[in-house]
Swiss-Prot record:
Record's protein name: Synaptotagmin-8
GO cellular component: acrosomal vesicle; axon; dense core granule; exocytic vesicle; plasma membrane; synaptic vesicle membrane
Gene Ontology BP annotations: acrosome reaction; calcium-dependent activation of synaptic vesicle fusion; regulation of calcium ion-dependent exocytosis; regulation of synaptic vesicle exocytosis; vesicle-mediated transport
Annotated transmembrane regions: 35-55
Extracellular-facing ranges: 1-34
Repeat recorded as keyword: yes
Chief localisation class: membrane
Underlying gene: SYT8
Species, as recorded: Homo sapiens
GO molecular-function terms, A-Z: calcium ion sensor activity; calcium-dependent phospholipid binding; calcium-dependent protein binding; SNARE binding
Subunit field text: Homodimer or homooligomer. Homodimerization and homooligomerization do not depend on Ca(2+). Interacts with SYNCRIP isoform 2 C-terminus. Binds inositol 1,3,4,5-tetrakisphosphate (IP4). Binds to AP2 in a Ca(2+)-independent manner. Interacts with STX1A, STX1B and STX2; the interaction is Ca(2+)-dependent.
Keywords noted in UniProt: Cell membrane, Cytoplasmic vesicle, Membrane, Repeat, Signal-anchor, Transmembrane, Transmembrane helix
Region (Disordered): 70-99
Cytoplasmic side, ranges: 56-387
Cellular localisation: Cell membrane; Cytoplasmic vesicle, Secretory vesicle, Acrosome
Length: 387
């Protein structure tokens, strides 16, 4: 008896345990059409390849991240430019490029001394990388140690860590006093209703600077000084101007942080026109307090054509005896002001008919009186008279 014939269409490969005809039988036994099975197989293949690619990318990122972290911690990998002539030779790494700024950032500064007029011109160009982790509203304050009471404040730059100042200020310093003079540049974060936050500062001994020619360099900022200048208090008030009627309204809200021991503090509001006393008003006195609350409003008629020529001075006075009064501190606003008072005045003009409130640090009376004569008038952009 012979063996039954074997179908040539389903040969069993040598050396395998697969059941002959298993896959064709499974395909034939499924209720789905063949094209659906092929499409499903292709989709499964694409999904498998995608998963493998994602896993490979994750592994590569982990391997790349580790050397970067190690490199950012090491100080030896920091790149910077050095020069053979340093403005401050006794301070290592003072000059640097903006990319090398450390925790407090850096400042670009130019210095020029006029031997004829005995003046030093300080050019504030820009700052970079002031503070990581969020934007600030920075401004700069410039002073010289030999010129007590004379300082310059820049305008506020909103929402930036790299403000561009492009402002120049001058200080009169006799050439003989240059070796002992120190230039101080302080940067602050502007806050309308609280104390301004220090961002860093630069102290540059002018005796170590070669002022025979114009200098322009980047300087690293250091931490703010632990001891801040003595404060005489703060005054909070609002300003409102209506160009069509010329009504300037000043609301004196409160003072705080005044020196203890004041008998009867009060606030005097004074308007000056073309550097001459024009109008003045004053609040009621508050007995025996270093934080008096006033909430008194005063209205002055200032024609729109005279806004650029007006100076507004708010001064806190103390009446210790019936016939004796002494100033505690003053705030000067107007087109000839600088820093935060100038910013407050500009905000009032830019937002006509709206009261703009702000808290200002009081400055010594002699300092404000001197600034009234020193500061040149700055033309501000005014609203339209019909607004």
């Amino acid at each position: 008896m012979g063996h039954p014939p074997v179908s040539p269409s389903a040969p069993a490969p040598a050396g395998t345990t697969a059941i002959p005809g298993l896959i064709p039988d499974l395909v034939a036994g499924t209720p789905w059409p063949r094209w659906a099975l092929i499409a499903g197989a292709l989709a499964a293949g694409v999904l498998l390849v995608s998963c493998l690619l994602c896993a490979a990318c994750c592994c590569c990122r982990r391997h790349r991240k580790k050397p970067r972290d190690k490199e950012s911690v090491g100080l030896g990998s920091a790149r910077g430019t050095t020069t053979t002539h340093l403005v401050q030779p006794d301070v290592d790494g003072l000059e640097s490029s903006p990319g090398d700024a450390q925790q407090w950032g850096c400042l670009q500064l130019s210095l020029e001394f006029d031997f004829g007029s005995q003046e030093i011109r300080v050019g504030l160009r820009q700052a970079a990388d002031l503070r990581p982790g969020g934007t600030v509203d920075p401004y700069a304050r410039v002073s010289v140690s030999t010129q007590a009471g004379h300082r310059h404040e820049t305008k506020v730059h909103r929402g930036t860590l790299c403000p561009v100042f492009d402002e120049t200020c001058c200080f009169h310093i006799p050439q003989a006093e240059l070796p002992g003079a120190t230039l101080q540049v302080q940067l602050f974060n502007f806050k309308r209703f609280s104390g301004h936050e220090p961002l860093g500062e630069l102290r540059l001994p002018l005796g170590t600077v070669d002022l025979q020619h114009v200098l322009e360099h980047w300087y690293l900022l250091g931490p703010p000084a632990a001891t801040q200048p003595e404060q005489v208090g703060e005054l909070c008030f609002s300003l409102r101007y209506v160009p069509s009627s010329g009504r300037l309204t000043v609301v004196v809200l409160e003072a705080r942080g005044l020196r203890p021991g004041l008998a009867e503090p009060y606030v005097k509001v004074q308007l000056m026109l073309n550097q001459r006393k024009w109008k003045k008003r004053k609040t009621a006195t508050k007995k025996g307090t270093a934080a008096p609350y006033f909430n008194e409003a005063f209205t002055f008629l200032v024609p729109f054509s005279q806004v650029q020529n007006v100076d507004l001075v708010l001064a806190v006075w103390d009446r210790s005896l019936p016939l004796r009064t002494e100033p505690v501190g003053k705030v000067h606003l107007g087109a000839r002001a600088s820093g935060q008072p100038l910013q407050h005045w500009a905000d009032m003009l830019a937002h006509a008919r709206r009261p703009i409130a702000q808290r200002h640090p009081l400055r010594p009376a002699r300092e404000v009186d001197r600034m009234l004569a020193l500061q040149p008038r700055l033309r501000l952009r005014l609203p339209l008279p019909h607004s």
